[in-house]
Amino acid sequence: MQNIPPQVQSMLAQLESYQQQLQLLVQQKQKVQLELNEAKKALEEIEKLPDDAVIYKTVGTLIVKTEKAKAVEELKEKVETLEVRLNALERQEKKLNEKLKELTAKIQASLKPPVAG
């Protein structure tokens, strides 16, 4: 790295930072996607049940009885919240990928030998 100009070293450090941010973002996105899939599946299953079905939900370390209508409402809210979160993460991922692409291009341009003309 001693032959690399300080400006390029700085860009390389920024590139590494972006890559780490992207990795964390992808992990968050996967977690939210998994939660969303689970919530949708639970909602799908609950909606198949009769209205008077006995339903239990976990609250912390407890399991409590709830009504079907309340469980459906809570799950729909959870799905909506997770979809909003997922969309936000996807937008962030897209922006970060664009920054990575731009910075990579800048670094490559900086490292190319000048063209004699």
UniProtKB/Swiss-Prot annotation:
GO function terms (MF aspect): protein folding chaperone; unfolded protein binding
Keyword Electron transport set for record: no
GO cellular component terms, semicolon-separated: cytoplasm; prefoldin complex
Highest taxon of the lineage: Archaea
Keywords, ordered alphabetically: Chaperone, Cytoplasm
Cell location: Cytoplasm
Primary subcellular site in the record, as a coarse category: cytoplasm
Record CDD domains: Prefoldin_beta_GimC (cd23162)
SUPFAM superfamilies referenced in this protein's UniProt entry, alphabetically: Prefoldin
InterPro entries: PFD_beta-like, PfdB, Prefoldin
Similarity comment: Belongs to the prefoldin subunit beta family.
Role, per record: Molecular chaperone capable of stabilizing a range of proteins. Seems to fulfill an ATP-independent, HSP70-like function in archaeal de novo protein folding.
HAMAP family reported for this sequence: PfdB (MF_00307)
NCBIfam families, alphabetized: gimC_beta
Subunit structure: Heterohexamer of two alpha and four beta subunits.
Name of the protein this chain belongs to: Prefoldin subunit beta
Species in which this protein is naturally found: Thermococcus gammatolerans (strain DSM 15229 / JCM 11827 / EJ3)
Recorded name of the encoding gene: pfdB
